[in-house]
């Protein structure tokens, strides 16, 4: 039962029960609480809310389903909103017959949605009026529910916001799916060959898809959007607060009006009660007097004395009248003094108004002076223009004069007094006139030089400036005086208001005194009339009527006692008491008339006694009245003194608060101006640096660098860093290539030496063969000379490129340092601006925000220090690389010297062999011709290969053109994004202006609220004065004050709740940031697992021809270059089609495949820019050029280095300018022992005799000594296969005998590379 009672006491259930009276349907008016779960009442309420209610004609649909459909349609059609929260479960509502906790929670959801429909419908006023009539607790809880619906997005959202969020979610899901599809497509393409044109087109489509993918917004844009959202939320809250305050003010005004009306009614009742009390007192006094008179009438003694006392009483009354007149005169004098004070105050006000008029006049004069200054400036500009024009005219005249003064060279003899002479004379006269005018103009110009005019103008300007400065100083002083006068004016206005209130009180007092005076005069007249009547009726028969009068007096006394008891017991029955009092007055009048007749018969002594008694009673009453008046006046004076002291204290406190607020506002405005200036400077510096970086990027892109879409400056810097590191890697690879070439040449020289020794041994047997062999050797020697020369040239080029790259690295380092400084400065400035904004909005939250920002700044500083350490480490690594390059250069020079010596020795030996081979017979010439034919056939094959390579080169050109188009499109997209950024900045600025305007409006409303609060305080003061007079009114005022305190406590509680909500939002933001970082890490992990197209090398040629073709430098057709005829020897179709060695992605990601030229590298090699630029494994064979974070370094060291491709060959450089731009991966590591050995690779390994020098077949062979014959001479094809390559793979059998047929072993999964040679 308690739970049911608590459920029905819930505000939403109470509201629904109250709404049953509004609905016109009669079935709902007879509503019972047991029928709550039927749903009829809620459905009828929805019909009342929505006039366009459309009932569904479906038979199987329940009432709750129909109700929910109508609610959702109402939100969508009328309010443009969507219900986001979890809808109430209809099965629970229909199944449960009684109201449990679960069913009531579902009903709460439904009632909440119904309340939102009711408050936002056309019948809004009806529901609001009903809600305002509830208790305060229910009102507060219903208001919280309404705020949940209107302000938060947990229950209901706008359609536009909902659609935007859905679009964002679909975009994010589509972007992730596209990246996965790219990975899958790359995996599929890695398993197939990449030599055909169709596969190149597919790769272009993939690249265009990746480039066209929408980029994620930058951190600055996200920060700006978050700031805008926070500002909008604050705006909404401020609006709701302002509306709530306006409503509260209206309610308070209505309450005050009602209370004022009640106070007036109570005052009227109090006055009536006071009058009734006075009359009752007068009746009691009359009764007592009558009793006294009756007692005194018994004693007929001293009648003469009474007559005398009556005379004295008249004199006393006269004296009292004089006293009252004097009091009236004193009051009139006080009124005159107050009127004088009023006049003085009015005079002061007039003087102040005159001062204000003077100020306005001064302002007008200042405006006139500014207008005159502007006119004078315009006149000065006109004068300067005229001066410039006069100078031009003078120059033109000077030129004309100079032309006129030039003597004519052709002098022809003419006849005197002829027409020609006359014309010449006329011309001369005109020239003289012109000269005279020119002289005059010169004199004028010399008399009024431009310097004098400029000096005069400058003097005038100085005077005007001095006048302006003085006037500005005067205006500043006047402004200060005006402010002071305004403060004094406000003080005087306050004093005037107080004086007016006091005057009103004094006027009320004067009116009361006048009324009292009139009443006293009336009483005197009535007393005289009664006294006369008493004297007239005294002569009648006292003895007859004495018994009757005694009886009547006894009755009257009894009746008075009964009336006294009734008045003490029942104060509420005033009407009855008034009627009884009237009856008593009538009876008393009759009794007085009768007693008057009795007293006439009495003697004068009784009259004297009566007069004395009356005088004494009047004196006592006058003294009591005076005492009461004095007490009231003292109390009033004390209250007014307290009021004045309190007002003075309040005024002083307000003045101090104003001063402190003004100082704080000035300081904050100065800080804001400084911060804005610093921001402008930092933005300009940042823009300059970004421009420099962009220019550097353009130069790098012209030189062949590839850039992706740049979203941030940090990404741009990272791209530049990657390009520099790639360049260094390329230099390293070239160094390795040169080293390999040197080793190849040394090996060839050793082969030549062996061949020469063989020739010496077989001089007698093969003289004819040696002649052809010598020719071949001479040709090879020529080729070696050319190779040495080319090596020297390449070394020089490398040195030059190294120097230029070092300079570029230094420049980039400087720019990166400047960017880091600017970024730190911008971060600090943004943080300070945010702090200032938060301090202006909420002074209580300022300290917490400052602490949080300090922690953030410390973290940022630590991150920057870590970044600087990393950069210093990178610099050290670059220096080490430079040193190693120098050492390699010295070694190459030594090798070059050794080669020259060997070449000289070989030359001498060839000369000796020529002398010996002259005697060789001609029979072996036929054999040599056959060899020549075979070589020609090989040449034709190479020519066909060259044609194929040319075709591939054309395809590469087409691909380069497509890439250029993509770059132009990227530039256009970047421009569009920059425009959008500017627009976003403009919108932010406009919104800031709107916020400032709303703040101004808020300040105005706060000032109005303060005025209203001051009025309320004045009313409360009046109420206090009335409370002192009446205790009941004081109790009511205390209740009002307690209600006020409760409202203030609620407001403070709401502020605390708002503060907690802000903290929750900040925590949610931090959680979102962490989630974002985790997502970025996951994306980077996906990018690391991506596989690129791989290609396998073709069958290799003999060593000598391959080395010769690798070292011949041929010009490329385009700037990017393509492959030449020598590239055919690098990669074959077999190398491209080789499957991967292992099934995992980690084994493949270490080494990308190499290519024959830079264009093939762009097509086939992996896109390093697509990977994370920070991932470079330092422990790898690449010499620390690839960076990797600490968490990935250990994973790579533990695995065996395996690659699905053949090792690199000697690349061919076609031109010295583009040789440094082509990057090749280094060869595989030497003598590297893997940490984890795979058992499959070791168990199924079977070496081949002709490929591995460590085989068991070759161990049995021994080296043939001098003078001995070989047991076995290899065929020519076998020798060619031997010298084909210095790296070859050993393939396993596809199905070993030990393994079963259904095993999952791949054909090339456990291949192992063996190396031999002299590298």
UniProtKB/Swiss-Prot annotation:
Disulfide topology: none
Any one GO BP annotation for this protein: positive regulation of protein localization to cilium
Gene inactivation effect: Embryonic lethal with few malformed larvae that develop to the L1 stage of larval development.
Signal peptide: none
Family matches, as InterPro entries: CH_dom, CH_dom_sf, HOOK_N
Example GO molecular function: dynein light intermediate chain binding
The organism's place on the tree of life at top rank: Eukaryota
UniProt feature coiled coil, ranges: 141-173, 218-690, 732-1096
Renumbered residue ranges of the record's region Disordered: 166-222, 1112-1236, 1289-1308
Biased composition (Polar residues): 204-222, 1118-1131
Gene3D superfamilies reported in the protein's UniProt record: Calponin-like domain
Protein family according to the UniProt entry: Belongs to the CCDC88 family.
Job of this protein: Scaffolding protein that plays a role in ciliogenesis, cilium positioning and dendrite anchoring in sensory amphid neurons including AWB, AWA, AWC, ADL and ASI, the phasmid neurons PHA and PHB and the gas sensing neurons AQR, PQR, URX and BAG. Its role in cilium positioning may be through regulation of the localization of cell adhesion proteins such as the apical junction protein ajm-1, and the ciliary scaffolding protein Rootletin/che-10. Plays a more prominent role in regulating dendrite morphogenesis in AQR than in PQR neurons. Regulates localization of hmr-1 to the distal AQR dendrite.
Protein name as catalogued: Girdin homolog
Natural source organism: Caenorhabditis elegans
Gene that this polypeptide is encoded by: grdn-1
